[in-house]
Amino acid sequence: MSTNYLIENIDWEKYEELAKNIIFQVQKLEIDYLVPILRGGAILGLTLASNLNLPTKYIRIKRSITNEINSDFGEAQMINSFDISEIKGKNILICEDTIDTEETIKLAKKYLSEYKPNKIYIATLYNFSKNYDYISGKKMDEHKWVVFPWERKLVQNEN
């Protein structure tokens, strides 16, 4: 699926605003483990772990063909995960940067459900999906390609 979305550049101040929105929502829940999806959910996962003092278990799913703006998407694939057997019977929070088609989230939920957690919550900085059950920094109706501060190219490759 090739995309041609409008581009929205996010600075660190905007990121912090979105993360605070999520923290305020998550504080009301009983979460035992954070499960960020690498790479996109890594920074949000670290932020939540620091602010909420929660243990973290990472999983890695690959979906975009490249990390370039308006990249093509492939089928979501589970690449690997860290040992997540400890989530059995626990309330977990999956962390992702953006959710649009929900393909990555569906794969993550299916994979994690095999370990029999008690409850699975989802947190995302930007929710472009029709699902309003997700904990969102911001719910958006119009799809955009979001460029987070940690994704900006600091040095251009000459290759």
Map each language-model feature to its residues.
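PRPP-associated nucleotide enzymes
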Residues: M1-N159
